Amino acid sequence: MRRHRALYGLALVVALWLAGAPARASSLTDPGPIAHGSLTTPALLDSLQRTAFDYFWNEANPSNGLVKDRSTLGSPCSVAAVGFGLSAICIAIDHGWVTREVGRDRILTTLDTFWNGPQGSGATGTIGHMGLFYHFLDMNTATRTWTSELSTIDTALLFAGMIDARQYFDTADSLDVELRDLVDAIVHRANWEFARNFGPGIRMGWTPETGFGGFGTWVGYNEAMILYILALGSPTHPVPASTWFTWTSGYNWSTQYGQTYLVFPPLFGHQYSHCWIDFRGIQDFFMVSKGITYFENSRRATIAAREYSIANPGAFTGYGPNLWGLTASDDPIFGYIAHGAPPAQNDNGTITPTAAASSIPFAPEIVIPALHHMYDTYGAGLWSTYGFKDAFNPGLNWYATDYLGIDQGPIIIMIENYLTGSVWNRFNEYADVATGLTRANFVPAAGTGVLPSSPTAVGLQLAQNVPNPFRGSATISYTVPTSGHVSLALFDVLGRRVRTLADGVEAAGRHDVSLSGEGLPSGVYFYRLESQGERIEKRCTLLK
């Protein structure tokens, strides 16, 4: 839960862990130092994803799969960070940063920890209770640390990463089958009815010391939408369908800086659920009444966040069209706090890079320039081992020293969804997710199901190459809505054209081309389709 992290700094003083981060595994290829200055967009996005993955690989205990909440020496595990990390491993396999076998082994180790860890109502020595998990765990013992709460939202984010991994490892291989069975067992053990405590909605937390006392009910709008979807879809301990109306009862629909949408000032609330669930083209009753989707809602929130920065009512240094993005993060004054806008919430001039970066599927036309601006203008102080540091305040010349797992995770996942949609595509196919959406009364949106203002509106279409990663050759399919000139080319991560796959007038309809890897070194490439003013890019990985 985001609201508990302000306690982190004080607790860390009295809870130092003496072991450092595990050494970088030899199975990974080191990208080497990155020079500051201009990068192509593909290179910048690739660097952001790679460094985010490195966080989850290096800041983990390989013996149990737990991931540190933050990069600080002595940090406990955040189970939400573990969930983000499981998806990061799947993405890394597609990029060739870790082999499928090594990545699967790490995931199986993680699943074993959460399946076999002791459950119970005791205050110590357990990993969770009623199939749910404590927010923070000791990195070595994998049991509750501090007086951490049994956190429903952090459990849901953990489960989301597990489900994504389950969907990724989809072959008949015995280890893939074992992985899928473990995920099903862990997810279906969760007693979501217990988490409701006989109330109308899902409670935020529980502790052995006070039970549900002091913990409120999750009421929207915020990051907990995915929690309700998973709890509604459980085949073993589901919550009643009526809980969705409890969730929507707190919605604040208003207009901010020219955008009308469900308001929640920190951008993480518009991102977390969307990391895994594809809300394009579907609506619940509330969104049917408003004529948009939750995806479009997040797009509007993103645009409003930028407009707030342009208006800059607080007159903070640097704010403008290419420097924006407020969310919960480290802070030079308060240690850790939920910044947000609009309306302004705890805004003191602190920008959090994950706020813009993790909004890239919603509004790439404003996110990508912001990422370039942050890298080019502030890179010397802002960019380090794991990419952009957690936050910075230009007016105070302050840069955070830490990286946070729950801020790194959305970066790698949302960039991947922007480029390939792969996480969305596999996650929505899980039966529990489909059931949860159905029980929440989601229906296909009117018309095409994709709003014209969305960057993924129907028109020029480009499919992911098959297979990906590929050896030798792959097939790329694309659809041209009307006859016209078409250009399809392959670029390396430095933005250099290395293959021309199509360049001429083509008829409307579907076209297939062969992509040969002959003469090219292994690595990540981008292929770009352009026609009649539209452009789409996707990533592919060549293995030798």
Task: Locate the predicted segments by residue.
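Short, compositionally biased serine/threonine- and acidic-rich segments at solvent-exposed termini, linkers
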Residues: 445-452
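Bacterial N-terminal signal peptides that target proteins for export
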Residues: 1-10
